[in-house]
Amino acid sequence: MTVGKSSKMLQHIDYRMRCILQDGRIFIGTFKAFDKHMNLILCDCDEFRKIKPKNSKQAEREEKRVLGLVLLRGENLVSMTVEGPPPKDTGIARVPLAGAAGGPGIGRAAGRGIPAGVPMPQAPAGLAGPVRGVGGPSQQVMTPQGRGTVAAAAAAATASIAGAPTQYPPGRGGPPPPMGRGAPPPGMMGPPPGMRPPMGPPMGIPPGRGTPMGMPPPGMRPPPPGMRGPPPPGLRPPRP
């Protein structure tokens, strides 16, 4: 359908139209759309029909029904007439135009989080968390490091939590070696891995002379007062 032939129909868009059907019903609604088969779309439509009385003495009565949005088939349409002008609010844009002046309100997104410039709220006294650096690893240990220092950082964190001795700064050497547990002399094999080395003689006693008189060997409890301890190695106990 060309626009020239339907220009008269386009001029009646948004008008209140009265449509009469073949069965005598009347539809009055706002004319919104049509096609080449004269199928119509009416909104806010009302139906009016005449009901014949059972008794010939009574007059015909008209019944009204509110239908709303209606799709009317063109094959049932007999005539269309203008019932009234378009509503006044038809030309009002539902969406604000680009150059239209705005009102007093300001459209903005819903607030999420804390806006910039607002001071952070402080916890009440007694409810705050531990002070930074107390109750956990130090700030130096928690600082991100390279891949090669992950193991060193983990060891330092374990030592700081377990209360190990103070760490020595790099370049000044480590802690002194323990006394009495040096490397084995040349020509002798050390203890296998996982075993403690044998206890050496106490400091101040030359090797090879055993324990002094009156002192029990390592690992034995001293005798009670008034009793003599066991004889040193290499000496026989006196006969009674």
UniProtKB/Swiss-Prot annotation:
InterPro entries, alphabetized: LSM_dom_sf, Sm, Sm_dom_euk/arc, snRNP-assoc_SmB/SmN
Main location, first listed in the record: cytoplasm
Organism: Erinaceus europaeus (Western European hedgehog)
Sequence repeat boundaries on the chain: 175-181, 191-196, 216-221, 222-228, 230-236
Gene: SNRPB
PANTHER family: SNRPN UPSTREAM READING FRAME PROTEIN, SNURF, SNRPN UPSTREAM READING FRAME PROTEIN-RELATED
Record protein name field: Small nuclear ribonucleoprotein-associated protein B'
Functional summary from the UniProt entry: Plays a role in pre-mRNA splicing as a core component of the spliceosomal U1, U2, U4 and U5 small nuclear ribonucleoproteins (snRNPs), the building blocks of the spliceosome. Component of both the pre-catalytic spliceosome B complex and activated spliceosome C complexes. As a component of the minor spliceosome, involved in the splicing of U12-type introns in pre-mRNAs. As part of the U7 snRNP it is involved in histone pre-mRNA 3'-end processing.
UniProt subunit comment: Core component of the spliceosomal U1, U2, U4 and U5 small nuclear ribonucleoproteins (snRNPs), the building blocks of the spliceosome. Most spliceosomal snRNPs contain a common set of Sm proteins, SNRPB, SNRPD1, SNRPD2, SNRPD3, SNRPE, SNRPF and SNRPG that assemble in a heptameric protein ring on the Sm site of the small nuclear RNA to form the core snRNP. Component of the U1 snRNP. The U1 snRNP is composed of the U1 snRNA and the 7 core Sm proteins SNRPB, SNRPD1, SNRPD2, SNRPD3, SNRPE, SNRPF and SNRPG, and at least three U1 snRNP-specific proteins SNRNP70/U1-70K, SNRPA/U1-A and SNRPC/U1-C.
